[in-house]
Amino acid sequence: MAALTEMVDYTVEDGVAVLTLNNPPVNALSHGVRLGLLKGVEKAQEDESASAIVIYCEGSTFIAGADITEFASGPQDPQLDEVLLALENSSKPTVAAIH
């Protein structure tokens, strides 16, 4: 397992890149989560051992929304649209494992 950021880990299991998000209590889309997702998608694109990507969240919530604790500090790159564009442009099928 490789930590992409404090909140996102990268592993490959049975040929699938697994991006595991862990940002308690609700896996909000903080700067660290957005950055980790972007790094994870980029890493999976380059990883010949991965043929697909799964995004999974620890805990009981799958990405509850923006991290309101960051509102006062202003926008930080990467913005959500950059992360979504990387997911959209990925040549590998991507699945969100929502539980």
Residue ranges, per PLM feature:
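Hydrophobic alpha-helix-in-membranes signature
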Residues: 24, 90-92
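Conserved CoA-thioester-binding segment of acyl-CoA-metabolizing enzymes
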Residues: 1-58
